């Protein structure tokens, strides 16, 4: 079920070439397109291709490999990674990597026989067994994949600075114990991620404390899914002062707690700045063996400064505290 705090827009990819060269895609896939990052279904290890004599011997067959996002779609012209393996493991128990290439459609000259071919496109991919004969042939891979672009805003449509926003993409299905397999961490906003069609669990983090939103998002083959998450949080800055509007007192230890007393964040300095989810909190400030505290409320979208008055005549000052 798609979370109600998601606003999704689907836009059909105009052509596969457009998807391959869309702004930001190349950078977004840098983790997925490196040759060592392969994750083949049922293939945990493989032997690297051996640097032997060229394959161009008397009897080779040419195989041309192409891939599309959807059935009858246009060929993907860039961003693919092809890996060709022998079908039987060697003495070391690994499948030997016969050949590999990057780009779009690729042709290989191989000894006739059976091979396993893996095509990866970002985080999308497919594996297929092929047969190579003496005659040239073409094999097409349908990746059944699409793109996902994520963004977030604060309550009321307030834009969140991109440097304070990150996403993590997980498999939707939970494993025993409630855990999910992590697909891609630390995704920047407005980055296009290529994924196989399906539902994914997305975690959006605003800041680095407790402003976290979780959503299930569906990726459709051949389409770009744009999802905007709504956070309900605010950036808060705390300072200890001797009087309202005064200068912040240095060397202050800070502890932020929920109204039930659960710790949220600790820091040291004249100021304590952090993003907090909306709700009620207590801020505790310790300076020179004195402890001061104040209750405050975080309202979504309303960034604010919280002053704690260092008034030693009030009951909140505790002398001799450790």
Please name every model-derived segment.
Residues 102-114, 121-123, 186-201, 206-209, ...:
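Short Pro-Gly-centered beta-turn/loop motif in secreted/extracellular proteins
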Residues 11-22:
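Bacterial N-terminal signal peptides
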Residues 1-8:
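N-terminal secretory signal peptides that target proteins for export/translocation
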């Amino acid at each position: 079920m798609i979370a109600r705090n998601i606003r999704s827009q689907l836009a059909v990819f105009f052509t596969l070439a457009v998807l391959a060269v869309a702004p930001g895609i190349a950078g977004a896939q840098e983790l997925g397109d490196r040759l060592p990052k392969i994750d083949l279904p049922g293939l945990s290890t493989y032997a690297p291709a051996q640097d032997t004599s060229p394959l161009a011997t008397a009897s080779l067959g040419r195989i041309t490999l192409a891939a599309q996002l959807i059935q009858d779609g246009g060929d993907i012209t860039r961003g693919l990674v092809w890996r060709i393996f022998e079908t039987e493991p060697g003495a070391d128990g690994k499948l030997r990597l016969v050949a590999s290439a990057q780009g779009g459609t690729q042709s290989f000259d191989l000894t006739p026989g059976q091979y396993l071919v893996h095509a990866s496109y970002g985080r999308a991919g497919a594996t297929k067994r092929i047969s190579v004969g003496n005659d040239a042939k073409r094999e097409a891979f349908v990746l059944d994949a699409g793109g996902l672009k994520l963004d977030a805003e604060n309550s009321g449509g307030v834009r969140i600075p991109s440097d304070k926003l990150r996403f993590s993409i997980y498999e939707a299905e939970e494993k025993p114990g409630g855990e999910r397999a992590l697909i891609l961490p630390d995704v920047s906003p407005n980055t296009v991620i290529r994924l196989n069609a399906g539902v994914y669990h997305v975690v959006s983090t605003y800041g680095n404390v407790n402003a976290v939103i979780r959503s299930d998002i569906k990726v459709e083959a051949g389409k770009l899914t744009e999802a905007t998450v709504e956070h309900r949080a605010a950036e808060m800055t705390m300072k200890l002062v001797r009087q309202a509007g005064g200068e912040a007192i240095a060397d202050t230890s800070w502890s932020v707690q929920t109204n039930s007393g659960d710790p949220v964040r600790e820091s040291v300095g004249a100021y304590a700045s952090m993003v907090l989810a909306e709700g009620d909190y207590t801020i505790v400030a310790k300076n020179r063996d004195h402890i001061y505290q104040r209750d405050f409320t975080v309202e979504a979208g309303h960034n604010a400064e919280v002053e704690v008055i260092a008034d030693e005549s009030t009951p909140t000052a505790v002398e001799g505290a450790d």
